[in-house]
């Protein structure tokens, strides 16, 4: 285990850090010596710090996520990241351990591919300009997000923190990559999980109801709220607290029925809610929002978890038909990135939990 970093200054004045790191393969640890420079902080959070750096041998930009390690537990994020290999998921290249300033402090450092933008910043850019994000981008970003979810769900992993800040974007190619697996977990049927996960605006209602036996469909709900945010230019359910979050959802979906509450959390006993009617979906969004977009969101943002489509099924929805056109182009004129469907379903196959999700009825 590497705990020592060696820093030195070159004649050029660059501060170079050399380290022995493990190659991020799912198998036997292979150690290599790497060095990087031009390190600067690009993100902070409760998890730790993210640095931007350049690998000395290739000048390739990388992101280094530094996380304080609890020695009592294996790091779940590292275990999961080593398993993942998908074009719409950020790639873990290397990892190493380093000592902290305090005695016995140990940090895990994940060296990840660097992707310059996020859906959050792209959406905020258009919002500040008082412009709507081009619909081709909504389709492109959502399709790739759903692809990444289809992949991780097929191997039993739930991300549990889908939000615009965790969706990285290459603005030139239009490629989206899902990042931050710090909350991710292998979900095992009938094994309890904590309900207090996922950022508030994007939390599925079963989590707000305190469910501990939830499924991968919490990620699908979160994806639906991201799509709604791209169409609206602001979060669809901007709650100030857990209870307020539920109020925001009820304002749109109406009061959940007793059966819907049971489907979200069978142990929930309080049924005292004001009776509010559902708001028509076409009145939630702008006048010229495509009917296919509204139809897809109405199927995803649904109280009953088993009624939400799987990511594979959602990818087959008519909203994404433009992406299947070989002549489709980005606003820049560039061709779309490769968008074949991955995972066990294969191209063109559909699996739904609640019947057809092909598109709005005529």
UniProtKB/Swiss-Prot annotation:
Q: Which organism is it from?
A: Caenorhabditis elegans
Q: Which family does it belong to?
A: Belongs to the protein kinase superfamily. CMGC Ser/Thr protein kinase family. GSK-3 subfamily.
State the gene name recorded for this protein. gsk-3
What GO cellular component term, any one, is given? nucleus
Subunit relationships = Monomer. Interacts with axl-1.
Q: Which residues form a coiled coil?
A: none
The source's superkingdom equals: Eukaryota
Q: What is this protein called?
A: Glycogen synthase kinase-3
Which EC number(s) does the record attach to this protein?
A: 2.7.11.26
């Amino acid at each position: 285990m590497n705990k020592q970093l060696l820093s030195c200054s070159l004649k050029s004045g660059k501060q170079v850090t050399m380290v022995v790191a493990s190659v991020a393969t799912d198998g036997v640890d292979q150690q290599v010596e790497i060095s990087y420079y031009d390190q600067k902080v690009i993100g902070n959070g409760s998890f730790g710090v993210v640095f931007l750096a350049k690998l000395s041998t290739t000048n390739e930009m990388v992101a280094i996520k530094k996380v304080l390690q609890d020695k009592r537990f294996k790091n779940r994020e590292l275990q999961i990241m080593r398993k993942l290999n998908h074009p719409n998921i950020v790639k873990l290249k290397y990892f190493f351990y380093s000592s902290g300033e305090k005695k016995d402090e140990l940090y895990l450092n994940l060296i990840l591919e660097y992707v310059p933008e996020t859906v959050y910043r792209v959406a905020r850019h258009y919002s500040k300009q008082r412009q709507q994000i081009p619909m081709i981008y909504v389709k492109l970003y959502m399709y790739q997000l759903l692809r990444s979810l289809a992949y991780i769900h097929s191997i039993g992993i739930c991300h549990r923190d889908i939000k615009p800040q965790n969706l990285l974007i290459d603005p030139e190619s239009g490629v989206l990559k899902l990042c931050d697996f710090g909350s991710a977990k292998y979900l095992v049927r009938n094994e309890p999980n904590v309900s207090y996960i996922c950022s508030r605006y994007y939390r599925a209602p079963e989590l707000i109801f305190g469910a501990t036996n939830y499924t991968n469909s919490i990620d699908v709900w979160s994806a639906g709220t991201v799509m709604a945010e791209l169409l609206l230019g602001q979060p669809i359910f901007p709650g100030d607290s857990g209870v307020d979050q539920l109020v925001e959802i009820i304002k749109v979906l109406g009061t959940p029925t007793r059966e819907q509450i049971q489907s979200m959390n069978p142990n929930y006993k309080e049924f005292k809610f004001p009776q509010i009617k559902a708001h028509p979906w076409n009145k939630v969004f702008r006048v010229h929002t495509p009917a296919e977009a509204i139809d897809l969101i109405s199927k995803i943002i649904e109280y009953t978890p088993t009624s939400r489509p799987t990511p594979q099924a959602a990818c087959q929805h008519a909203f994404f038909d433009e992406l299947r056109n070989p002549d489709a182009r980005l606003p820049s004129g560039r061709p779309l990135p490769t968008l074949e469907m991955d995972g066990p379903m294969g191209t063109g196959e559909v699996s739904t939990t609640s019947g057809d999700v092909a598109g709005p009825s005529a």
